[in-house]
């Protein structure tokens, strides 16, 4: 299990290490650069996706508030791991945003898929049987964020306006 880029010479256990390496090697970017950073995010197995430090061991099985009768302590632990991986992913995204905050930059963030983590049935991962509204909600609805730096907003107000106008339009990440 490793994160990778065309730039790095070693695998990384955690996304934050990949991001640090990327910024160290690519700090001076050319004027027009497209960088794609593919993160592990909260991918199964979520307990492997974040450093188990005091900062990121934020959620526990006891902090899971879901009340399904079939939810076991072990399932609650898996939900907590997923929540901790999400918390860590937020920190990683914050690191990326802060890096480009003063640049003329646009960042697009999206997931390749969702994960079902005991949301409505005793199931974890991506199982599309039976296909229905809950499967679509938990496995196919994904975050899609477009962030523009202040410098970009000032230089390209027409593009920013078009982005804002598209906020509630449907989109698909399938290509």
Task: Please tell me what each predicted stretch does.
Residues 1-175:
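Catalytic domains that recognize anionic headgroups
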